[in-house]
């Protein structure tokens, strides 16, 4: 049952403050003292009442805050429940969609595998038919091989004869391949030989041309040498003549020098090989004689005039 604020404070106040009966005394001071005590009790009761009011308000506020928090949590829980239900529905829908996709995929794979097996079966049937036709076509060959095996006891089974035949065929193919390789090598060698011959012919042609040029240069050098030999002979002859002429000139100069010295009555002081000195002496002698003759020529007309 709810209690109003007025009733709550009235009850508390009535419990804490109970009026005491006044004693009938004749003393006014005691009455005054009693009134003061009552006032103090009322003040203390009022303070207690205020404290209780404050405590009650804080309690009510905390209760209200707690109640609001509980309401908020309830709303959050309700939202979480709704979200969880939605999440469960989405998960279930995804699971159902994934399951449907997997079922369709498995069904598609099974259909594809079935089609592949049918195609393979068809191919195997065709291959069996081809093999049967091949066996029928090769049956005469098998009979021939059996008769050949009977005539050649070296081979115990037809497979041995066939293996021998295959060996011979492979050997023949290998020999043919080897022959083709040898032919290719021979063609390559022949081509190299022709190339070398062509190169050698070109080289011989170049060498012949060089030889011809060298022979021509040799002939020209010989002619040039003969020309220089002729010139050298001419130079030697000219040098011999000039040497002879020089010797004669030296002898003439030496004779003139001797004559000059004899004319002067002096001894020979210069070396025989000092041609320039000898010529200088002869030159001075001639100049002196010429000067003397000139003086005589000048003096003779003067004497005649006297």
From Swiss-Prot:
GO terms for molecular function: dynein complex binding. The gene is Cfap73. One of its GO terms (cellular component) is axonemal doublet microtubule. Keywords: Cell projection, Cilium, Coiled coil, Cytoplasm, Cytoskeleton. This is Cilia- and flagella-associated protein 73. It is found in: Cytoplasm, Cytoskeleton, Cilium axoneme. GO terms for biological process: cilium movement; inner dynein arm assembly. May play a role in ciliary/flagellar motility by regulating the assembly and the activity of axonemal inner dynein arm. Belongs to the CFAP73 family. It comes from the Eukaryota. Residues 49-139, 197-231 form a coiled coil.
